Every structure is written in C-alpha cells, then in structure tokens.
Amino acid sequence: MTQSQQVSADPAPLRTPADYQAQLDEKRERLCGLFADFTLPALEVHASPAEHYRMRAEFRIWHDGDDLYHCMYAPATKEIIRVDQFPTASRLINQLMPVLLEGLRPHPVLRRKLFQIDYLSTQSGQICVSLLYHRKLESEWQQAAEALQADLRAKGFELQLIGRAHKQKICLGEEFVIERLTVQGRQLVYKQVENSFTQPNAAINEQMLGWALDVTKGSEGDLLELYCGNGNFSIALAQNFRKVLATEIAKPSVDSAQFNIAANGVDNLIILRMSAEEFTMAMRGEREFNRLKGVDLGAYQCNTIFVDPPRAGLDDATVKLVQDYDNILYISCNPETLQANMAVLGETHEIARFALFDQFPWTHHMEAGVYLKRKAG
C-alpha cells in the first residue's frame, strides 16, 4: 500500500455506557423477535466490555517513503483509514502497535513489501505477531527480525514473532500463545496457535463457558462435541460429565486440544480426529476406522451433544444426527441459521435456556446459545 493512495486519520467515535446499552438492547429485541414463534424462557443477556475486548486484530500496512502505519478499510466506502490506536482491540495490542512500528521503521529489510500485521493477544500477557510480506524472506530478514524480537522482549513484551510469505513461514520462537481464562472461579489454560481459530472476545468466552457449565450442571451420562477446535468448550465442560468424546478434523487443532487436556489435568476427555459423518458411521457400527483402535464407543452413553457450527449453521444431515440426543447445547454465531435449524429441532426438542452473548459489540453480529431438552412423550 503506497503513498499514492488517499489515507484518512481514524476518527475514533465518542461512545458512552448509554450508547453501549442501547446497541445491546437493540440486539436483545432483534434476537427475541427472530425466535418469536418458539416458546422461550427468559433471555439471559451477557454484556461485553465496551472497548478493548477483541484479542485478535489484523491491519494492512501503509508505506509513506521510509515511514509506515497501520491502516484499515472503511466498510462502506473502502476508504483507507490510518489507525494509530484501535479501542476495539486489547490493551496489549494497543500498547504494542506503536512500539512495533518504531522498531520496523529504521530497517528497510523489515519494511520492504510488508503488507499486513496480525496480532493474537491474551489476558495472560502473551502476544504473537505475524508480519506478512509480498516477497521471499531471506536470512538477512531473519537476522533483523530476531534483533527486533529481542528488543521488544527487552521492553517487556512477552512476544512471539513470525514472518510469512508465499509458501513460507519463519517462526522466531513459538507459533502459539498460552491463554488463561477464569470460569466460575477456576482457571483454565489454553494453547492458541497463530493463524487458527480462537474465540476473539475473551471476556465473552469466559461467560459462554460459565453459561454452558451452568446449563449442563447435574447432567447424566456422557457428552459428545462435534468439531471441538482446541477443546475450548469440551475441556471446561468435562467436569459436568462422566466422560466426553469430541471430534475435530484439523490436525493443528487436535494437537492444541491434546496439549490443553494435559495442561488442565482433564482425564475423562478423548479427542477423535474425524468428521461428524465418520463418527456417525462408527457410532452406528456401519464402518470401522483405524483411528478408533483402543476406543470402545460402546462404553459411552452420550445423552448430551454440543455443537458450535460456523455461520452457515448445521447442514440437514447433522441436524438429523443432533436430534438423536436428549439434550442439545447449541452455540451459534449466526442466530438466523440457528432459527432455521430450530425449525427442525423444535419438532422434537424445546428450548430450556436461551442466551445472548455480545461477542461483537458495535456491530450487527450476535452470538446466541440455546439448551434444548427432548419433549416429553
């Protein structure tokens, strides 16, 4: 991104607590309206911090001669906006942003064809920074980047620095950070890997985990989770169940989940690297898988299933699979697809608990949670 393009200063909006409450009330009304055709319990609303809530941020880089700045595109106009501070992002990201640019400016080898910087921060104080380039990274870059990382660490940042280019990734330390979340008074440890999915709002993540624990309190039998990622939910929920089975297909996520199981001393959770479709075939005895050697599926009585699908929601086949379970815990990042899935799930199950999580304040997006129980008779 070059100086020939127009760049505007970031006009940070002045927002008050009343403004935050107003946007939260609008989401509450919209969510209740979306589910007006269902018999609903009282909606449980979980508010976010109004600023410094986002643990991840990505910025394009604008070059002006020997200088450079973070910038973003305005959603409506696509205008390039210079960003010196970003109140949406964590305080740690905001602290590092100017210091990192200060470290990059004197070094052409670090600046040249740098087009994006990604930040992954934690509440624990650790942060991972990825520098993305439109060129191959040579040994000269690595030497300069190692010096930059050492300088930033000397300034008090518990930082991991990564360089990325086409088909190239150079990790100068680790490619992950360790997050610590407090859930119902208990501290949970999570390995979060660069460039893989993690919950963006740590405060809301803690509230979602606490809510999931509360709604499944006193559960009988075992839990099945489909596509568990790094074990974010299954590790927290394991204390409420005799045993937990979780599936995940991405190897980096499975590796992180195994690390997190050990780090949290969980001894009743098994992660299976397989798809929901494969697991269904195995559970019904339709096919055998080498990956299940040593796992006795017959020893599990999964009365409860947990799903946290992408924005598209559950496909028709998975909805039918989920209906087989007495209790369904469903976290949705798109209540419209949750509503569509509920058109089917509502035939057999009723909504026992209903929650709104303000994962993305100041945006249209909402996160919703429902706990469904099989209808009597």
Curated annotation (Swiss-Prot):
InterPro entries documented for this protein: MeTrfase_TrmA_AS, MeTrfase_TrmA_CS, SAM-dependent_MTases_sf, TrmA_MeTrfase, U5_MeTrfase_fam
GO MF annotations in UniProt: rRNA binding; tRNA (uracil(54)-C5)-methyltransferase activity, S-adenosyl methionine-dependent; tRNA binding
What is one Pfam family matched by this protein?
Answer: tRNA_U5-meth_tr
Residues that hold S-adenosyl-L-methionine according to the record:
199, 227, 232, 248, 308
Alphabetized, the UniProt keywords read:
Methyltransferase, S-adenosyl-L-methionine, Transferase, tRNA processing
Catalysed reactions, semicolon-separated: uridine(54) in tRNA + S-adenosyl-L-methionine = 5-methyluridine(54) in tRNA + S-adenosyl-L-homocysteine + H(+); uridine(341) in tmRNA + S-adenosyl-L-methionine = 5-methyluridine(341) in tmRNA + S-adenosyl-L-homocysteine + H(+)
Which Gene Ontology CC terms are recorded? cytosol
* GO BP terms, alphabetized: tRNA methylation
Q: Its biological function?
A: Dual-specificity methyltransferase that catalyzes the formation of 5-methyluridine at position 54 (m5U54) in all tRNAs, and that of position 341 (m5U341) in tmRNA (transfer-mRNA).
Q: Which PANTHER family match?
A: TRNA/TMRNA (URACIL-C(5))-METHYLTRANSFERASE (PTHR47790), TRNA_TMRNA (URACIL-C(5))-METHYLTRANSFERASE (PTHR47790:SF2)
In the record, the note on similarity to other proteins reads: Belongs to the class I-like SAM-binding methyltransferase superfamily. RNA M5U methyltransferase family. TrmA subfamily.
**Name listed for the protein in its UniProt record:** tRNA/tmRNA (uracil-C(5))-methyltransferase
Q: Which organism is it from?
A: Aeromonas hydrophila subsp. hydrophila (strain ATCC 7966 / DSM 30187 / BCRC 13018 / CCUG 14551 / JCM 1027 / KCTC 2358 / NCIMB 9240 / NCTC 8049)
Organism lineage reads as: Bacteria, Pseudomonadati, Pseudomonadota, Gammaproteobacteria, Aeromonadales
The gene from which this protein is expressed is: trmA
